[in-house]
């Protein structure tokens, strides 16, 4: 055993001597640079959703298609608003947020919108936001995926007509549920 240990020690010493004779030296490490790198997504995060929900593969339309999510500073994706689907989603399980559906309470639906659209800004933009925020789903009046939100193109007269139509239904139907107003119902 001592012969083996002697040979091993001699080998280590010989290799150290060989390196020193060949001029191998250590060089200082390069200074850390101030370069900043930006993380880019390698795949479309909406690809799985678009397989079934947008067969034309145009992707998300309208204002939400080109904005940055203020919460994570990344482009808005399907899951930002609709949530993460379960593995059973492709089999038809309704496990993501479907706006303007009675199965979700107004507060649940609107809390998704309010995570980016601050109530103070909405209140300044148009006073009915303040009045209806807890009673009517945002999707009752606003389209989510068209090229242009219908409410943005309506004249004041058109907006008043929507108010009158909805409030007329409310007066004539005691079971009226403002969360299920089908003005601009989104199709899956």
UniProtKB/Swiss-Prot annotation:
Signal sequence region: 1-32
Family matches, as Gene3D superfamilies: Cytochrome C3
Annotated positions binding heme 2: 78, 81-82
Cellular component GO terms held in the UniProt record: outer membrane-bounded periplasmic space
Modification after translation: Binds 5 heme groups per subunit.
Keyword Cytoplasm: no
One MF term in the entry's GO annotations: heme binding
Domain of life: Bacteria
UniProt binding sites for heme 5: 163, 166-167
Binding site for heme 3: 113, 116-117
Binding site for heme 4: 138, 141-142
Pfam families xref list: Cytochrom_c_NrfB-like
Record's subcellular location: Periplasm
Pathway participation: Energy metabolism; nitrogen metabolism
UniProt binding sites for heme 1: 49, 52-53
Listed GO biological process terms: anaerobic electron transport chain
PROSITE patterns documented for this protein: MULTIHEME_CYTC (PS51008)
Keyword Heme: yes
Keywords from the named record: Electron transport, Heme, Iron, Metal-binding, Periplasm, Signal, Transport
Function: Plays a role in nitrite reduction.
Protein name, entry field: Cytochrome c-type protein NrfB
Organism: Escherichia coli (strain K12)
């Amino acid at each position: 055993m001592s012969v083996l240990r002697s040979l091993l020690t001699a080998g280590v010493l010989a290799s150290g001597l060989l390196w020193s004779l060949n001029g191998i030296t250590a060089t200082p490490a390069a200074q850390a640079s101030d370069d900043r790198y930006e993380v880019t997504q390698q795949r479309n995060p909406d690809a799985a959703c678009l397989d079934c929900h947008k067969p034309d593969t145009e992707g998300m339309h309208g204002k939400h298609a080109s904005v940055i999510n203020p919460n994570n500073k990344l482009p808005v994706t399907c899951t930002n608003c609709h949530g993460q689907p379960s593995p059973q989603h492709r089999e038809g399980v309704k496990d993501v947020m479907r706006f303007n559906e009675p199965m979700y309470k107004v507060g649940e639906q609107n809390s998704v919108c309010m995570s980016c659209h601050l109530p103070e800004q909405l209140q300044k933009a148009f006073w009915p936001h303040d009045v209806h925020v807890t009673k009517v789903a945002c999707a009752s009046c606003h389209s989510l995926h068209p090229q242009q939100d219908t409410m943005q193109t309506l004249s004041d007269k058109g907006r008043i007509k929507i108010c009158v139509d909805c409030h007329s239904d409310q007066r004539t139907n005691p079971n009226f549920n403002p969360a299920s107003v089908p003005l601009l119902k989104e199709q899956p």
